[in-house]
Amino acid sequence: MGLAKEHKTEIITKFGDSATDTGKAEVQVALFSRRIADLTGHLQQHPKDKHSRRGLLMLVGKRKRVLNYLKKVDIERYRKVLADLDLRK
């Protein structure tokens, strides 16, 4: 259950400098957030799917680590990502 290519390229061009800029922390956080939202919807329909729940928790942890890195490196970019994605922290 991955992201469609169109959604992925849309997120990359919105948060990255170019269409191939997938390594930027903002792009990674945005992609993780989209996958988390998709998995959350899946788990609301299938509450007993424990394997997907574990995947969701792993994605949340990855996003948290990238956000902590971004906060440590550049606080302004961190705040902008939180505002753009409506994440609370």
From Swiss-Prot:
One of its GO terms (cellular component) is cytosolic small ribosomal subunit. One of its GO terms (biological process) is translation. It comes from the Bacteria. The keyword rRNA-binding applies. The keyword Ribonucleoprotein applies. It holds the Pfam family Ribosomal_S15. GO terms for molecular function: rRNA binding; structural constituent of ribosome. CDD domains: Ribosomal_S15p_S13e. Keywords: Ribonucleoprotein, Ribosomal protein, RNA-binding, rRNA-binding. Belongs to the universal ribosomal protein uS15 family. One of the primary rRNA binding proteins, it binds directly to 16S rRNA where it helps nucleate assembly of the platform of the 30S subunit by binding and bridging several RNA helices of the 16S rRNA. Forms an intersubunit bridge (bridge B4) with the 23S rRNA of the 50S subunit in the ribosome. Part of the 30S ribosomal subunit. Forms a bridge to the 50S subunit in the 70S ribosome, contacting the 23S rRNA. This is Small ribosomal subunit protein uS15. It comes from Chlorobaculum parvum (strain DSM 263 / NCIMB 8327) (Chlorobium vibrioforme subsp. thiosulfatophilum). The lineage of its organism: Bacteria, Pseudomonadati, Chlorobiota, Chlorobiia, Chlorobiales. The gene is rpsO.
